[in-house]
From Swiss-Prot:
Domain remarks in the Swiss-Prot or TrEMBL record: The J domain is necessary and sufficient to stimulate DnaK ATPase activity. Zinc center 1 plays an important role in the autonomous, DnaK-independent chaperone activity of DnaJ. Zinc center 2 is essential for interaction with DnaK and for DnaJ activity.
HAMAP family xref list: DnaJ
Family matches, as PROSITE patterns: DNAJ_1, DNAJ_2, ZF_CR
Oligomer and partners: Homodimer.
GO cellular component: cytoplasm
Cofactor(s) the protein needs: Zn(2+)
Zinc finger CR-type: from-to: 136-214
Protein name in the entry: Chaperone protein DnaJ
Record-annotated J domain positions: 5-70
Organism for this UniProt entry: Pseudomonas aeruginosa (strain ATCC 15692 / DSM 22644 / CIP 104116 / JCM 14847 / LMG 12228 / 1C / PRS 101 / PAO1)
Entry keywords, A to Z: Chaperone, Cytoplasm, DNA replication, Metal-binding, Repeat, Stress response, Zinc, Zinc-finger
Amino acid sequence: MAKRDFYEVLGVERGASEADLKKAYRRLAMKYHPDRNPGDKEAEDKFKEANEAYEVLSDASKRAAYDQYGHAGVDPNMGGGAGAGFGGASFSDIFGDVFSDFFGGGGARGGSRGGAQRGADLRYTLDLDLEEAVRGTTVTIRVPTLVGCKTCNGSGAKPGTTPVTCTTCGGIGQVRMQQGFFSVQQTCPRCHGTGKMISDPCGSCHGQGRVEEQKTLSVKVPAGVDTGDRIRLTGEGEAGSMGGPAGDLYVVVNVREHPIFQRDGKHLYCEVPISFADAALGGELEVPTLDGRVKLKIPESTQTGKLFRLRGKGVAPVRGGGAGDLMCKVVVETPVNLDKRQRELLEEFRKSLQSDTSHSPKASGWFEGMKRFFDDL
């Protein structure tokens, strides 16, 4: 099935800013994340689709290539990538439950013609609790990746031997093919763009120069991160081939849903249930914050839905600036499971209000409006 346009996937215009892209991705990531949709294959596919779109459009060079050439500009299998790896299957594809696409990757990318090639970038989704994201933390992760083979020091050749120059391309990694009136340059089909051939491969890596390994890494997460933020670990991606530099690892943050708070940028929101009596007479109650409990004064005649702002009780942004606010929305609860005496008291209270609508201004206005509506019919 043909891929959808990346801008369409994120629901943004082609000229969208970086902030708009991030906001759109964050919304989709929160909506379709597997933690929120266990067993939902469609949601999982949409989550991966959003990841792929964001990884391309959030990178200036990849976005430029995509804008000019479409999917072909960022697809290594359509002329933009480098040589094959592990029998044509990328290690990151093998571990697709942990990693999504390379950040523009194939077996390796960014390498020079015929020789050393940079390793692929990798992506790791890091799930955090809201408290961890707000305060910052250090976590240990295990990343399946490719590392340089120690037996052959990454050459792919059996110790004591060396790779030889490819006779098909003469060591440049590219060949020219005649197609009608046109001559096109393509990756050498024999050496896969490396410019070298291995006649006696290393027994440990089978000539690949790289082996599979679970790498354990410590990641320092700064305070204030949010869903969609990326932490770059330079050189922690896949090892390069033929002595090329390693790629990078991008740790993408996903903040789990919190049972009390909802986050919007640097502000937090929560609902606070209050009793009918406290709403009418006023009172004081404790509300939770990420720093502990605080007192909240409820004035008399408080209506459900009223917002109370606790300044500075939100989140300090990761890029600096003052902390946001905590917005508490009160919800007046109707009393239930009343005993006989409580029902009698409420009945007396109701009777006392029947002749005086000033105690319920909204209800009074509503009934007056309804009366005028029927009078006009």
